[in-house]
Amino acid sequence: MPDLTPLWISIKVGFISTIIVSILGIFICRTLYKRKGHATQFLESLILLPIVLPPTVLGFIFIIVFSPRTFVGQFFQNVLHLPVVFTMTGAVIASVIVSFPLMYQHTIQGFRSINPKMLNTARTMGASERKIFYRLILPLSKRSIIAGIMMSFARAIGEFGATLMVAGYIPNKTNTLPLEIYFLVEQGKENQAWLWVLVLVAFSITVISMLNFANRDKVQEVD
C-alpha cells in the first residue's frame, strides 16, 4: 500500500488555495470588470504575469518577499504565526499566486460578457449595484466562475517549480504530488513515481472533460 500522504497534502493545498483564489478573484473582478484605461491594463498585466514568468523566477521572488528578514515575512511569522518559507503555508501561497490568473481570466470574461443593457435596465428599475451584482452578474457568470475554480484547483494540484523553491521537499509536510514524483525519479523509484503520474493524468483528463462538457452545454444553450 503506497503512502498516501503526498495525495492528501496536494488536496489540502489545492483546496485551501482554491478557496482563497475564488474569493479574491470574484472580489477583484467585481472591482475591475467595468473599468478601462492604462491603470487597469497595467494591473491586469501584473495579475496575469505568473502565467508567463518561469516558476523559478516566481519562487525566487516569493523567497525574497516572504523571507523572515522582510516586513512581509515578519508579519506572517510574528503576527499571523504562519511562517512561510519551507512550510505548507508557503506551498499554499505559491499555489494561490500561480492559479489566480486562471480564476481571474475566466471570471472577468464572464462578467464582461453580460449585456450592459440588461444591467442598465435593472438600474433604471431601482436596483442597487450590490443587488445587481448578486442577483444578475453572479448567476449569469456562474459557468465562467465554476470553470475558473476548476482550472485554479487543477493548477494548484500541479504546481511544482515555485512550490519547490518556497516550501521545499519536506516529507509528510510539503511533499505535494509533483514534488513527490520528482524526488522518486531522483531516487530511481520509477515504479512508485508512475502511480502518482497516472493519478495526476487521470485527474487532469477529468477536469478537462468536465470543462468541455460544460462548454458544450453552453454552446447548445446559445444555439
Predicted regions and their residues:
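Periplasmic/extracellular loop-to-transmembrane helix junction in inner-membrane transport proteins
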Residues: 1-19, 35-37, 81, 185-190
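Transmembrane-helix boundary motif in ABC transporter permease subunits
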Residues: 16-47, 60-62, 110-113, 117-118, ...
